[in-house]
Regions:
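Carbohydrate transferase catalytic cores enriched for Leloir-type hexosyltransferases
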Residues: 1-70
């Protein structure tokens, strides 16, 4: 299964929806089956500190538009 998530708030908001999104993704990662993937769609790279709060896994991938910038 492939799950897409609008991750704009995850990489830009420290509290509120950003915190909720990071907690949601971090809660889903341990439940993923071998072939499952989480695709986190965001229009920019956002804040590295906030991106790093998401569990690093081969099954989690950020997806940016071709013209994405900091």
């Amino acid at each position: 299964m492939i799950i897409g998530y609008d991750a704009k708030r995850i990489v830009n908001n420290n509290t509120g929806l950003g915190s909720y999104g990071r907690n949601l993704i971090n809660s889903l990662v341990p439940l993923l089956e071998t072939n499952d993937k989480l695709l986190l769609y965001t229009p920019s790279f956002g804040n590295e500190e906030l991106r790093s709060q998401v569990i690093h896994s081969n099954q989690v991938q950020y997806v940016y538009p071709q013209n994405a910038s900091n």
